[in-house]
Swiss-Prot record:
Gene source species: Cyanidium caldarium (Red alga)
Pfam families: EF_TS (PF00889)
GO molecular function: translation elongation factor activity
Localisation per UniProt entry: Plastid, Chloroplast
InterPro entries: EF-Ts_dimer_sf (IPR036402), Transl_elong_EFTs/EF1B (IPR001816), Transl_elong_EFTs/EF1B_dimer (IPR014039), Transl_elong_Ts_CS (IPR018101), UBA-like_sf (IPR009060)
Protein family (similarity comment): Belongs to the EF-Ts family.
Name of the protein: Elongation factor Ts, chloroplastic
Gene name linked to the record: tsf
Cellular component GO terms held in the UniProt record: chloroplast; mitochondrion
Cited function: Associates with the EF-Tu.GDP complex and induces the exchange of GDP to GTP. It remains bound to the aminoacyl-tRNA.EF-Tu.GTP complex up to the GTP hydrolysis stage on the ribosome.
Keyword annotations of the record: Chloroplast, Elongation factor, Plastid, Protein biosynthesis
Length: 208
């Protein structure tokens, strides 16, 4: 009995608040995760993120017919973005939490000049093949055995291409998690599918 009391006492209101700010999930879920891990916020955060991944996988194919279009114009008025983010219900789309998510993603897009695609799977095969062909000509790989060479090429290409994908970028407000992790957290919170559908990034003079 005393052991249970000791474990529960470590779950302070401050810890619950910190975890809720990081994840956006309910107070109840935060408290349960913290109690399970004896007040260890890092482990509790990891569990909530894993739960979000499982829920995201479960809801991945559910139709998202609602959502928002958000925009962000940088303070110098020389850069901006538009993004469409979809969800399943009108109530989620009209919530303050969802509006904040959309605005945050719009800011993220402006902060990441290399991105061209939402996710890795959106990159056309011809683009992937082009990078593979270029990388295979690297001088430092010419004397490598074929198996090692192919493995190195795949690793380098994966790293380069993921720099072009919005979901793979480090969150501008917390670089310990990616944009994909953030979306999964919100899926866990709303208990419905959320998808970044498309985006556009604008910079003055970029087409000149």
């Amino acid at each position: 009995m005393s052991n249970k009391s000791s474990k529960t006492s470590k779950v302070s209101i401050d810890l619950i608040k910190q975890l809720r700010e990081k994840t956006g999930v309910s107070i109840k879920d935060c408290k349960e995760a913290l109690r399970k891990h004896d007040g260890d916020i890092a482990k509790a955060l990891r569990e909530i993120q894993e739960q979000g991944s499982a829920i995201a996988q479960e809801k991945h194919n559910r139709i998202t017919v609602h959502g928002r279009i958000a925009s962000y114009i940088h303070i110098n008025n020389r850069m901006g973005s538009l993004v469409e983010i979809n969800c399943e219900t009108d109530s989620a789309a009209n919530s303050e939490e969802f509006a904040k998510l959309c605005q945050h993603i719009a800011m993220q897009i402006v902060a990441c000049p290399e991105i061209k695609y939402v996710k890795f799977e959106d990159i056309p095969e011809e683009i992937k093949n082009h990078y593979i062909e270029v990388e295979s000509q690297s001088k430092d790989l010419q004397d490598k055995p074929a198996q090692s060479k192919n493995k190195i090429i795949r690793g380098r290409i994966d790293k380069k291409l993921r720099r072009m994908c919005l979901l793979d970028q480090a969150n501008i407000k917390d670089d310990k998690v990616t944009v994909n992790d953030l979306i999964k957290e919100k899926i866990n919170k709303f208990k419905e599918n959320i998808q970044i559908n498309r985006f556009a990034r604008f910079t003055i003079g970029e087409k000149i």
